[in-house]
Amino acid sequence: MRLRFTKMHGLGNDFVMIDAISQRVTITPERARQLADRHFGVGCDQVLVVETPDSPDADFKYRIFNHDGSEVENCGNGARCFAVFVRQRGLTAKSVITVETAVGRMVLHVQEDDQVTVDMGAPILSPADIPLAAPQQATSYTLPTQGAGDITIGAVSMGNPHAVYCVNDCKTAPVETLGPEIEAHPHFPKKVNAGFMQVVSPSEINLRVYERGAGETLACGTGACAAVVAGRLQGLLENTVKVNLPGGSLSITWEGVDSPVMMTGPATTVFHGQVKI
């Protein structure tokens, strides 16, 4: 069969969008890996799938497959693209869209200029729920590494786990070497996304993220949220922060513990196509 898809990106974090409602298709890890392959497939960081929700209270189910075929819990940049995509496909005309994910619900607010604000929910800070091997919850943790010795990180889950490491300069941060080590660190039993954060001012940070299962990407929405939460908990940042990523900037707002993290940024359609599967 020929599978219809749309290629989109959020600040360079690129996606193959699949409508599995109006076309009968099942996306398996193997099929996702084939689609994501930049040499033999369409090519993307993640494959995002729109499905019929299990609950009548949600508009859609949102599934995310990494470049390596692994299915993951959440993707913030993808959520913005998801909201624009379902409207483009005529699956909904709503400007406020509720989606099911593997770890709960997300609410997506589409604005007239295709900027999308995503209610990412409250961050998860308990080590057992991140998950992180630590005796008790703290604003920062010590992580022993081969490449940099003992480093201090913040640890947050935005539905997927993040370690946030403060650096003096993002441009020279050891993302390519330390990123894979943090990602696979035994203190994180489900692996972890590794964020390298440079605080420019209390209202602005620079950020690079080595994503679990994908490597470094041009942007990571959940990583931006996690970095702001970690920075706020350590007293470094204000409630609303401009997050500069290699692919562009996001606005992240977090009022504090138990409040949802709100992420605002663009979603861009690149092209529509078909691929034989």
Swiss-Prot record:
Keywords: Amino-acid biosynthesis, Cytoplasm, Isomerase, Lysine biosynthesis. Its EC number is 5.1.1.7. The keyword Ubl conjugation does not apply. Coiled coil: none annotated. It holds the Pfam family DAP_epimerase. Pathway: Amino-acid biosynthesis; L-lysine biosynthesis via DAP pathway; DL-2,6-diaminopimelate from LL-2,6-diaminopimelate: step 1/1. The record marks H162, E211 as: Could be important to modulate the pK values of the two catalytic cysteine residues. This is Diaminopimelate epimerase. The gene is dapF.
